[in-house]
Amino acid sequence: LVSEETGRLARLIQNMLDLSKLESGEYQVNARMFNIWETLTGVALSAEQRINDGMIDIDGLTMDEKVLVYADPDLIHQVAYNLLDNAIKFTPAGGTIRFSVEKLGPEVEISIWNSGQGISPEALPYVFQRFYKEDRSRGLHARGAGLGLNICKVLVNLSGGQIRVESQQGEWCKFVFTLPTQPPNPGEMKRLPDESGRPFCYSMAYKVLHIHFRYRQKWD
């Protein structure tokens, strides 16, 4: 119990630090070409003990294929770790977590699928909102601060991709995100929505990205 609470607190602190970096006004991304399968395998190995303790089967991982993406490896490692952590939390003993990677033209689509209770249709639109506790939508005791999936969305968007969730309640859940396969044109401008739906801007140079992030405090 002590170990579980220590891990929960450590994850909460790390999530708050990640948000603090994003909200500081400027966030630097060091993007390069790398093999997404190496990242996914590394993330799975880092969670090996929890996977074994939960008697969960891992399917789809391969090092035989080389699929290159253009992004910051550290940020994508964090995204994949958060999504795998979420999958482990909601996969029952004897269940399965499945990784897949698919090339789609100028993008690569990465998915992490898990068997289990899934998410209700009513909850699906809200799972990426900050502080949303999807645990409640699954009839489980609330765990975590509801920050991990929101951080995933921000980091994937910063990397030039998109993220979505699909689910069949009572059967499975799948998180899917995309990443570019080539660097953007120097000086390319993009506009991404913040949580209120209003756009904020960031400018991307060839290797470094700077973001001006607007944070709106929410009061109960």
Name each model-derived stretch.
Residues 30-35, 52, 57-67, 104:
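Conserved catalytic submotifs in the C-terminal HATPase_c
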Residues 4-9:
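Short alpha-helical segment of the dimerization/phosphotransfer core of two-component systems
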Residues 94-106:
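Short beta-strand/loop element within the Bergerat-fold HATPase_c
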Residues 160-161:
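Conserved glycine-rich
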Residues 24-29, 68-71:
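Conserved micro-motifs of the catalytic ATP-binding
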Residues 119-133:
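Short conserved segment of the HATPase_c
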Residues 30-48:
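A conserved beta-strand-to-alpha-helix junction within the catalytic ATP-binding
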